Amino acid sequence: MEKKDFPKGTKPREIFVYTCERIAEPLIPLGYKYRKSKNDIYKKDGIFVFSFYFSPSIRFGSTTFTAFFDVSSPVIAQWRSEQEGTEETYDGIVGTSIARLTHRYDDFPRYEVSTLLERERSIQEISGQIQDYALPFFARFSNLPKLLDDVEQEGFFPHR
């Protein structure tokens, strides 16, 4: 997808969606799907769903957002439902700001994407965090015994 500069007066939602599409682009060949309606990029892999979602603040012309990741499992949700005796329950395992996977001090950054320069910087930063930190974090779920041992000893985020 080409870099795109938007004319003044472009709706914030259009800029936000374009930014999400650009972030999703390199993940599509890896089996991820982008859902414009949910502001997320997700992939089902075995019993897990790995996702990235973007929380926009597009009110009153603002074009800022926060980027998050999430690991969930319908299997875990079913187990919790049986344990709790309820029909609906939470399927989440772990999720927070993507930046929390890094050693960054500001671990809940808001990304401004109104100008071409800001948008390109944000796309590069988030894409880098996904490639360098989130995808390796998701890969840990392919070896559950080791993951459980690691989490028991150090938690999900040993660098925190």
Feature locations, PLM:
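Intrinsically disordered, low-complexity regulatory regions enriched in serine/threonine/proline
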Residues: M1-Y18, R22, Y34-K36, Y42-R160
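Acidic, metal-coordinating catalytic segment for phosphate/diphosphate chemistry
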Residues: L27
